[in-house]
Design a protein with these regions (language model features):
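Residue-level detector of Asp-centered blade-edge/turn motifs that repeat once per structural unit
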Residues: 1, 43-45, 100-101, 148-150
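Short loop/turn segments immediately following the C-termini of beta-strands
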Residues: 9, 53, 63, 110-111, ...
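Structural signal for beta-propeller blades
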Residues: 12-14, 56-60, 113-115, 161-163
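Short loop/turn segments immediately following beta-strands, especially the blade-tip
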Residues: 15-21, 60-70, 119-126, 166-176
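Blade-edge beta-strand/turn elements of extracellular beta-propeller
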Residues: 23-28, 69-72, 78-82, 123-136, ...
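Asp-box/WD-like beta-propeller blade repeats and closely related beta-sheet repeat scaffolds
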Residues: 24-95
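Acidic, glycine-rich loop-and-beta core segments that form the ion-binding/anion-interacting portion
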Residues: 130-183
Length: 183
């Protein structure tokens, strides 16, 4: 079954896409925050990440087997002060994505010029921050993607107008990761 997720004033709305292309509303789920700006689904269709530009919040929700949106699993607010007073004087989460193995969630914040890295524990559903990529001031990290083999992270910026490439490696310990900028 195909499912469409949309941001709405009240949170997130899920729709089943019917064979004729029509949409059938499944449900609406509140995110306990301001309207999001970006949605991402994990590889196994188990989780939905909502990026909150206006309130600096990344919200993780469960997805039900029928495609409807389940309850909030966890959520984190970014804190800090940005580098451009006219626009980025506070956190603005622009992208949140889970790695394909569901171990990590990365959260890009163009307001404070950072990408925060969280370890995701499926057992208790918690996101625990383990690292931060501190980007160049006034660069505004906007979106990112991993390479299919997850060896590289491609980070795109809104203001800087470049793509940085990071080598992603894991150590032997659960929270031992390294994101080395190589380009």
């Amino acid at each position: 079954q195909k499912t469409l997720y949309s941001i709405a004033d009240e949170g997130v709305v899920s729709f089943r896409i019917l064979e004729n292309g029509a949409l059938q509303k499944l449900n609406t789920q509140n995110i306990r925050g301001m309207r999001g700006c970006h949605l991402a689904i994990d590889q196994f269709d188990q989780y939905l990440m909502v990026s909150g530009y206006h309130d600096g919040k990344a919200t993780l929700l469960a997805l039900n087997p029928d495609g409807s949106v389940g309850p909030i699993v966890d959520g984190v607010f970014d804190k800090g002060i940005g580098s451009v007073a006219e626009r980025t004087f506070r956190p603005h989460v622009s992208c949140a994505r889970m790695t394909d193995d569901q171990k990590y969630i990365l959260v890009a914040d163009l307001g404070i010029d950072q990408v925060r890295v969280f370890r995701f524990d499926k057992a208790d559903g918690r996101m625990r921050q383990i690292d931060t990529i501190r980007c160049e001031l006034k660069s505004a990290p906007r979106h990112f993607r991993f390479s299919p083999d997850r060896k590289f992270l491609y980070l795109m910026y809104e203001v800087k107008n470049v793509i940085d490439v990071f080598r992603f490696t894991e150590g032997k310990k659960p929270n031992d990761i390294n994101l080395e900028k190589i380009q």
